[in-house]
């Protein structure tokens, strides 16, 4: 196995753990409410403790990766996630549970930023899409396992279920240790200057626009569609099966989407995926049948895999064009992504409660449209990414 592929596999395993930990807690919320006497707000704190720190960590990694190296930060993050998962598994109180989940989120932020930069900095020339697709495919596989881990924890106990996740996280530590350091990220001067320089590039702007469309649409879908299906009498198991099918499809589509990105270009693939995503809130605002809403849940997995396969090569191409390290672009992406997935469910929930579900979808659609228009404008002026991808890594 080549050095670059060892990096990709190591990061993919950590992304698998990250996705499974984020989603595993959802089926367990009723258990935590009963065991720790939590209010609805307290249950919300358990969920929010994971992503709340990611934007700050992502920006911090931009300064730290050039100094310490992406591999070292990945190793430290993987070790931190392993320890936090063990503590989470046997948390004796709600406070320990929330703190352990907060630490898992700290590790998640640096994995998304430093580790993805490690992948794109060292991907073979012309194959960033392929390597990014492999990672997002493994992320989708983690999304499959998350609800299953939660179900196992409810049946066999948290110690066994999350202990198994900790073992996989430890495997990620070992794989990261054995992977080569690869190219070192070059310091880009002041963090803010690097962020601005990267954000001004058309490719980075396109990547950010794709991310915004995705997090707006699926931030709404993740909250409102399961609630709607539940109100129509469909079981948790049926909803979980639909999500699992989507995640399985995402795991299969990820590598294929990466190869498509390398062949057709990230702008073409990314803008096509974003166009499909923009349609989703429009369709859901029309109150379609349950079958259509189940279809949306299934479509989420492969659509996310395609988005990820295009988004990371776009952001790294923008970093190359700006003359900054890839971690600058991935840090910016991570901050936007995590911030969006923290804010959007709160916004959508407030709108749905104050007005209606249809009104919430209409607002999301209206927010998606400017991002999609910006994407189309950026795509028109992006130089052919194959040329950017073939350039020297920074």
Regions found by a protein language model. Give the residues of each.
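Paired small-residue
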Residues: 84, 95-103, 291-300
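Cytoplasmic helix-loop-helix junction between adjacent transmembrane helices
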Residues: 100-139
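Helix-breaking motifs and short loop linkers at transmembrane-helix boundaries and internal kinks
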Residues: 37, 69, 90-95, 233, ...
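Conserved MFS/SLC helix-loop-helix module at the cytosolic interface between two early adjacent transmembrane helices
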Residues: 56-92, 261-264
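Juxtamembrane intracellular "pre-TM" segments in multi-pass secondary transporters
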Residues: 1-4, 179-207
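C-terminal membrane-cytosol helix-exit motif in multi-pass small-molecule transporters
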Residues: 166-185, 372-379
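Intracellular juxtamembrane helix-capping segments at the cytosolic ends
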Residues: 111-123, 307-321
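Helix-loop-helix hairpin linking two adjacent transmembrane segments in secondary transporters
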Residues: 134-177
């Amino acid at each position: 196995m080549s050095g670059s592929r060892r990096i990709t596999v190591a990061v993919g395993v950590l992304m698998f753990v990250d996705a499974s930990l984020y989603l595993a807690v959802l089926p367990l919320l009723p258990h935590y409410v009963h065991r720790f006497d939590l209010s609805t707000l307290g249950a919300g704190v358990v969920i929010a403790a994971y992503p709340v720190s990611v934007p700050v960590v992502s920006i911090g990694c931009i300064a730290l990766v050039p100094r310490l190296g992406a591999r070292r930060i990945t190793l430290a993050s993987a070790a931190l996630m392993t320890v936090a998962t063990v503590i989470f598994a046997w948390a004796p109180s709600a406070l320990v549970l929330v703190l352990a989940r907060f630490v898992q989120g700290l590790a998640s932020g640096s994995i998304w930023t430093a580790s993805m930069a490690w992948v794109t900095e060292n991907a073979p020339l012309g194959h960033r899409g392929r390597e990014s697709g492999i990672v997002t495919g493994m992320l989708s596989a983690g999304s499959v396992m998350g609800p299953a881990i939660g179900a196992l924890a409810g049946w066999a106990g948290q110690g066994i279920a999350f202990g198994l996740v900790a073992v996989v996280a430890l495997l990620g530590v070992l794989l990261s240790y054995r992977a080569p350091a690869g190219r070192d990220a070059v310091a880009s001067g002041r963090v803010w200057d690097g962020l601005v320089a990267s954000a001004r590039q058309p490719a980075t702007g396109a990547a950010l626009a794709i991310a915004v469309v995705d997090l707006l649409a699926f931030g709404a879908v993740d909250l409102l569609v399961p609630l709607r299906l539940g109100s129509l009498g469909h079981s948790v198991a049926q909803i979980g099966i639909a999500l699992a099918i989507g995640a399985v499809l995402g795991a299969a589509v990820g590598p294929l989407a990466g190869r498509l990105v390398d062949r057709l270009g990230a702008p073409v693939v990314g803008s096509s995926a974003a166009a499909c995503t923009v349609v989703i809130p429009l369709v859901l605002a029309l109150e379609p049948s349950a079958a259509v809403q189940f279809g949306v849940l299934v479509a989420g997995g492969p659509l996310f895999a395609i988005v990820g396969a295009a988004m990371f090569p776009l952001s790294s191409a923008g970093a190359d064009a700006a003359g900054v390290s890839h971690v600058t672009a991935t840090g910016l992406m991570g901050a936007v992504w995590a911030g969006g997935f923290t804010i959007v469910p709160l916004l959508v929930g407030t709108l749905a409660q104050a007005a209606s579900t249809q009104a919430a979808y209409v607002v999301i659609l209206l927010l998606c449209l400017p991002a999609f228009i910006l994407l189309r404008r950026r795509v028109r002026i992006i130089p052919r990414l194959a040329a950017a991808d073939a350039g020297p890594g920074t």
